[in-house]
Amino acid sequence: MTKLSYEVSEDINFLDKEKSQFIKDYMTSVKFPWLYSNCSTNIGDENSMFSNVLYSDNQENKYYIPICEDLIKHISPLEIIRIKANLTTNVDTYRNVFDYHTDFENIENGLTSIYYVNTNNGGTAFENGKFVKSEQNKLVTFPMNLKHRTVPHTDNNYERIVININYIKD
């Protein structure tokens, strides 16, 4: 694990290669449904995306087990708050900037982990100035109250796919 700052840590090769490739193949196949949203983090922000809430309100959907089982085993959360898969498409330039946000507020000992399903030149930017590049099988973890945002990709990959995991560790 590499600490990028006092708040952000990065785990490269988080899962074994076979499981990482399975998740990527599964989430880019016709077996996995993506739901369109005409905004990303704030209503009216004009940043569309696709998503699928895999776990929320103590309920998992049918796609939870094949995708999340190994992730959760490695993270070992005390309590899962939400797991959400996000897909954004490539853009021509970086002018399409997503807003800084937190996924949830006022949750004591809350953490957010982002698992990068595929590699591209986008990533996640943090309000403290740190940047994490989207690289397949990387997990970045940070306090839930640290503002972050999607940095869209401009390379030839059609999609940027991440799994956001919000949880309580201790």
Question: Would you name each region that the model predicts?
Answer:
Residues M1-E79, V91-Y94:
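Non-heme Fe(II)/2-oxoglutarate
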Residues S113-I114, L139, N156-D170:
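A short hydrophobic beta-strand segment most commonly corresponding to one strand
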Residues T93-Y100, E108-G110, Y116-E135:
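A short beta-strand-loop-beta hairpin characteristic of the jelly-roll/cupin
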Residues V132-R149:
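Conserved metal-binding segment of the jelly-roll/cupin
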Residues L87-T89, V117, Y167-K169:
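Short beta-strand segments enriched in hydrophobic/aromatic residues
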Residues D99-H101, K147-D155:
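Short beta-strand His + acidic residue motifs that chelate non-heme Fe in jelly-roll/DSBH
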Residues F104-N109, D155-E159:
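A generic structural micro-feature
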